[in-house]
Amino acid sequence: MAQESPKNSAAEIPVTSNGEVDDAHEHGYNRDLKHSLPSGLGLSETQITSHGFDSTKEGVTEAGAPQGSSAPPLPCVLSPSRVAASKLTQQAGDLTVPAGGQRTHTKGGPVILADEIKNPAMEKLELVRKWSLNTYKCTRQIISEKLGRGSRTVDLELEAQIDILRDNKKKYENILKLAQTLSTQLFQMVHTQKQLGDAFADLSLKSLELHEEFGYNADTQKLLAKNGETLLGAINFFIASVNTLVNKTIEDTLMTVKQYENARVEYDAYRTDLEELNLGPRDANTLPKIEQSQHLFQIHKEKYDKMRSDVSVKLKFLEENKVKVLRNQLVLFHSAVAAYFAGNQKQLELTLKQFHVRLKTPGVDAPSWLEEQ
């Protein structure tokens, strides 16, 4: 430690009334000094020195023994100093932390992080802007087509298949509605036949003179009710199969058709924009717009071609599945109705067994899918 003359090294050591060093002042100053430094800047990174004979010695002072003394030197003591704290605060304020984590000196100001953080609000705003622009283009295209001013891309063969599918769906929905009405009426008739059979059976027991007559009618009504329940099971199975075909299989295909039509509108909208730009002048301002429009047109053209291919494949598989399902269900419906009105109970039961139709026993819950495996 460099020795200075007594004239320049007036050590300031606060002491108590007992002659001991006042540690409370030292700890309080160190705490204030740490609070005044920015995060990451330690005491080891700061230096306070005195220059000149007449400069004010505040902050760091050296307390040492006089020259020639055998006593060991006293350690450095930090005494509270507002001037030193203000200087350290100014030095710390001139530091910024760049992206690499290194500190560089600036003129002053708060600590700034150079890493760019993506703003979620800006990303959402950009998505909304793109969606609004796309919606505007598609709406303009639809209005132009309805007014007869714009052109639209048409696949005649595919459009004809889609129209037939929609027309068939309406007809199948009508058949489904009528079959449900028949099932409801048949259920009420079977319920009435059961009640009538029970009434005949009760009267056959109480009327000895008409015992046989009431008994025959009771047996007939019970047999009709039993056959009606069998026919009702076949009709309900027919309804369930047609309902799955109409409201799930066909509906799924029509959802794909809807996506195809939306892709067609977008394709025509961006095609129209590209055609309008190509008809205009070509200069330094319009060429970037034409290139961007060409890029967007190509993207929507690929999307349109893909959706058209998907619709064609789905229509093909739907037609095959529809023929297979409806053929089996129509044969079941015809055989069950014919056997019921012919009074052929064995043929009616054989028909249900042939098509794997299970009748629900009254008072017994249907088995779960695990029990059916």
Swiss-Prot record:
The modification N-acetylalanine is found at A2. Residues 153-353 form the AH domain. Residues 22-35 have a biased composition (Basic and acidic residues). The modification Phosphoserine is found at S5, S36, S39, S69, S79, S132. Its main location: Golgi. It is found in: Golgi apparatus; Golgi apparatus, trans-Golgi network membrane. CDD domains: BAR_Arfaptin. Keywords: Acetylation, Golgi apparatus, Membrane, Phosphoprotein. It comes from the Eukaryota. Residues 1-47 are annotated as: Disordered. The modification Phosphothreonine is found at T361. Pfam families: Arfaptin. Phosphorylated by PRKD1; phosphorylation delocalizes ARFIP1 from the Golgi and disrupts its ability to inhibit the activity of ADP-ribosylation factor, an important component of the vesicle scission machinery. InterPro entries: AH/BAR_dom_sf, AH_dom, Arfaptin_fam. Gene3D superfamilies: Arfaptin homology (AH) domain/BAR domain (1.20.1270.60). The keyword Acetylation applies. GO terms for biological process: intracellular protein transport; negative regulation of retrograde transport, endosome to Golgi; regulation of protein secretion. GO terms for molecular function: phosphatidylinositol-4-phosphate binding; protein domain specific binding. GO terms for cellular component: cytosol; Golgi membrane; trans-Golgi network membrane. Plays a role in controlling biogenesis of secretory granules at the trans-Golgi network. Mechanistically, binds ARF-GTP at the neck of a growing secretory granule precursor and forms a protective scaffold. Once the granule precursor has been completely loaded, active PRKD1 phosphorylates ARFIP1 and releases it from ARFs. In turn, ARFs induce fission. Through this mechanism, ensures proper secretory granule formation at the Golgi of pancreatic beta cells. Forms homodimers or heterodimers with ARFIP2. Interacts with non-myristoylated GTP-bound ARF3, but not to GDP-bound ARF3. Interacts with ARF1. Binds with lower affinity to ARF5 and with very little affinity to ARF6. Interacts with ARL1. Interacts with ATG9A. This is Arfaptin-1.
